[in-house]
A protein has these predicted regions:
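Serine/threonine-rich low-complexity intrinsically disordered regions
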Residues: 26-28, 32-35, 39-42, 63, ...
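N-terminal carbohydrate-binding accessory modules
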Residues: 1-61, 155-156, 178-190
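Short catalytic/ligand-binding loop motif for oxyanion handling, primarily in non-cytosolic enzymes
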Residues: 67-69, 104-108, 141-143, 174-176
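Aromatic-lined substrate-binding rim segments of carbohydrate-active enzymes
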Residues: 42-104, 150-161, 165
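Active-site-adjacent "subsite" loops/lids of carbohydrate-active enzymes
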Residues: 103-122
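Active-site region of glycoside hydrolase catalytic domains
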Residues: 118-190
Length: 190
């Protein structure tokens, strides 16, 4: 199932394709996935808190251990619940940027982490409420050049999800590349 893109990254900012408006996402107020799942079906209070445009976009923190509590053992019941809540968000036109996070030593486990997030993307592939994924700081700070963990993360998730937009902290990207190079990346910097 191919989902039509509703958002795009231009000049390192997020824009609605149909509205042409710049859209802000408050990553400082990102909601933990457990809390997001608890409010399923009643997103009106969340939407009211999101300022600005008609396109309401929020960030949801997704810990790696929620997806893969043990090595190579995905929590399919959690992923099914997460998908269901994202489908409910879709019905209310609430959009989500997934902010994956992991514990220490993420750079050493980048391939396993990326595999878990790719698995997550496959499980939520029909959720048009998903704008895209943020690249964790530990990966973004290593660079987006070919063969680097951040580039691998984006490439792996983009394979079957061309409509996703990717996000990264500006400070993390600046650590890895020249600012002029970072500004050329198809990323939304925050």
């Amino acid at each position: 199932m191919k989902i039509e893109a509703k958002f795009e990254a231009k000049n390192n900012k997020l824009y609605g394709i149909f509205s042409g408006q710049e859209i802000s996402v408050d990553f400082n107020s990102a909601m933990p996935v457990a809390d997001f799942c608890k409010v399923a079906g009643d997103f009106s209070a969340i939407k009211e808190k999101i300022p600005g445009s008609a396109e309401k976009v929020m960030a949801v923190v997704l810990p790696w251990e929620k997806v893969e509590p043990e090595p190579e053992a995905y929590d399919e019941s959690f992923l099914a619940e997460f998908r269901e809540v994202l489908k409910q968000a879709e019905e209310t036109e609430l959009f989500v940027v997934i902010l994956p996070c992991a514990g220490e030593n993420l750079a050493e486990k980048a391939e396993e982490f990326t595999a878990a997030m790719k698995h997550t993307a496959r499980r939520i592939k029909d959720c048009s409420s998903v704008v895209g994924f943020a690249v964790p700081d530990a990966l973004a700070s290593l660079g987006f050049c070919e063969g680097q963990p951040a580039e691998f993360f984006v490439e792996e998730l983009s394979c079957k999800h061309a409509h996703y937009v990717y996000f990264a902290k500006k400070a993390a990207v600046e650590k890895s590349t020249l600012l002029s190079e970072a500004l050329q990346l198809p990323l939304v910097l925050y």
